[in-house]
Amino acid sequence: MYDIVFLAGGWGAAYDLGFSDTLAAGISKAYYSGSIIGAICHGPLGLINSKDKNGNILIAGRKMTGVTDKQVKELNITMTPLHPEEELKKAGALFEAKTKFLDQFAYHVVVDDEKRFVTGQNQNSGHETAQRIMKIIAESS
């Protein structure tokens, strides 16, 4: 297994990550194998269908972030089938975000309490998301 599984975002992720049963099963397997799971932008959509050992949604009750509904509207990409803020909330995640004049200029990184999921709000969060993941890896070694 891997130390880290990372889901990059981008608008294309809205068309496939949240619909893939194979990815959902892989995320669950990675989680139970001890991997740290990171995602930015639309990448967290790949987490919404992963299940725990009891069949419950794995991310329910966990702090997470991703692209905001406000940013989806600002970028005029409402035609995409899945929107991270909306879908993470539906999955029971505790959604957090920062806002600015335009959300595409904001950035925010969230680490869940267990330090197993590290999510970044948008493309501006990539560097800090990676740094946080590497810090968790270093502290656990």
Task: Give the role of each language-model region.
Residues M1-S141:
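Active-site-adjacent pocket-lining segments in enzyme domains
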